[in-house]
Amino acid sequence: MRTHFCGLVDETLIGQTVTLAGWTDVARNLGGVCFIDLRDHEGIVQVTVEPVAGDDASAELFKVAASLGYEDVLQVEGVVRARHAVNDKLRTGKVEVIATRISILNKAAPLPFHAHENPGEETRLKYRYLDLRRPEMQRMQRTRIKLVQALRRHLDARDFQDIETPILTKATPEGARDFLVPARMHPGEFYALPQSPQLFKQILMVAGFDRYYQIARCFRDEALRADRQLEFTQLDMEFAFVRERDVQDFVEDMMRAIFKEVVDVDLAAQFPRMTWAEAMRRYGSDKPDLRIALELVDVAELVKSSEFPVFTAAANDADGRVAALRIPGGATLSRKQIDDYAAHAAKYGAKGLAYIKLSETGEVSSPIAKFFSEEAFAALLKHVGAGNGDIVFFGAGGYTKVSDFMGALRLKAGKEFDLVAEGWAPLWVTDFPMFEWDEEAQRYVALHHPFTAPAVDDIADLRANARTAVSRGYDMVLNGNEIGGGSIRIHRPDMQSAVFELLGIGAEEARAKFGFLLDALNYGAPPHGGIAFGIDRIAALMAGTESIRDVIPFPKTTGAQDLMTDAPSPIAADQLAEVHVQVRSKQV
């Protein structure tokens, strides 16, 4: 139906007859001439229709051109010629196609929005097929496609095996809720959609495949936001007979190559490394954005003898923290803006936010100054590096909570004061805690997942020091986004059972839920480790969008709906009966 793509018609084709197919981007009838911007996935070319006096065929052609509306689907035959007025905004702007034939392949109904408009997100998702026609959306989808193609080429060339793992599998506790699928042939029993291929890829290492990868679809029934979807795609990888640095060095080289190939970005020749403890101390986050130069400063030693009880209580608590954040130029903040920062911190658990503001002339404005002697106050300002024109925020309380809300303030200040440097800042965060204490459940939970190996090999040591145990987990962070997470796995069945026990999973429950894994580890499991990268998140970073929905062809809303297909939707009673499911009416 076509000889060339619209966006690739250029000067080399001048004088030649071409056949094009695409959508009517714009049609303009200027009376004596019609101009049609014809669009396909490669771009736009101008089609010109010039009626010839006394020529019935050209008059009919002009009539067809004059009748065209937005998004009508056309096949156009014509001769390429040089344009009198060059359009530098188009790749095809030096040429035009003089139409000799136009066939309307399909008429478009009146549009809810035009391809060059940017309507509300609900409208975009309801008419996703129209949204995806927009040049910006085409660009972002192509970025994703190039990313996946480049990853496959890179791994295939290095002897990784692309192996599929089951979509219908066993429900296992991995942090989020499972999506459940009733098993028709086994009444009362259910499959689960995988939250990740974690256990299958470990079993593939036991099976001797050595190097595995998969572009895997994963499913988690959890609350949605701009960087999270119910179903998502990850690059899943696993290596046999490796230590942490073996995995990290390989995927670091891979990321450098992929970013160069896909978006022509040169990532750092060596990614910096930081322990989890250092990241939390300096940045209040386990995924710090290193483009923002601001850092948290611990001030507990300077305030533990002050007369401000909020500070002294936290400073004298072994699990407490008093941290400061200096914002250069922050003295311009009004009282209302300071209250806005306090409200932002409250979203992350802050019960209050103290501050010291220094005017350009050195005048102090602070609700906490009265609690310090002149010498102690001066020492505090010196310790945090405060100068004229700055504001310093202070947070006090439990260590983790203070780190969280002060880290959130750091990000807010970085963006609002234009302190985010241009470029790309990759980072390895290592040595994560093995466990964290869940106050509500009154038990330990795994910070990564239950299959991450501890840094110690001795089970007695792990049991005795579970609260402070460090794991062999690691994350790759880019511009404040965790783009990959991995670890060295537990390969000994006795260690895996001990970790289950520490997580409150007894022997009987472990056997019921993970018996297949424990059995596999008993038959000569090699030391192994791996990592998984979020394809959606990396594609969004490469495409320059904050929402992963922009790089997913058919995403869900934050309300977990597909507006285009109207999913989820009710199921007929006979279908439910086939899978032995009854729906209870919603309790009011």
Curated annotation (Swiss-Prot):
Reaction(s) this enzyme catalyzes, per UniProt: tRNA(Asp) + L-aspartate + ATP = L-aspartyl-tRNA(Asp) + AMP + diphosphate
Which ranges of the sequence are coiled-coil? none
Q: Name one GO molecular function term.
A: nucleic acid binding
> Kind of enzyme, top EC level?
ligase
Q: What is its EC number?
A: 6.1.1.12
Q: Does the keyword Heme apply?
A: no
According to its UniProt entry, the function of this protein is described as: Catalyzes the attachment of L-aspartate to tRNA(Asp) in a two-step reaction: L-aspartate is first activated by ATP to form Asp-AMP and then transferred to the acceptor end of tRNA(Asp).
Segment Aspartate: which positions?
Answer: 198-201
Listed under subunit, the entry gives: Homodimer.
Q: Which UniProt keywords apply?
A: Aminoacyl-tRNA synthetase, ATP-binding, Cytoplasm, Ligase, Nucleotide-binding, Protein biosynthesis
Lineage of the organism: Bacteria, Pseudomonadati, Pseudomonadota, Gammaproteobacteria, Lysobacterales
Species of origin: Xanthomonas oryzae pv. oryzae (strain KACC10331 / KXO85)
Which superkingdom is the protein from?
Bacteria
Biological process according to GO = aspartyl-tRNA aminoacylation
Quote the Pfam families the UniProt record gives: GAD, tRNA-synt_2, tRNA_anti-codon
Q: What is this protein called?
A: Aspartate--tRNA ligase
UniProt-annotated binding residues for L-aspartate: E174, R220, H448, R489
Q: Which gene encodes it?
A: aspS
- Binding positions for ATP per the UniProt entry: R220, D221, E222, Q229, E482, G534, I535, D536, R537
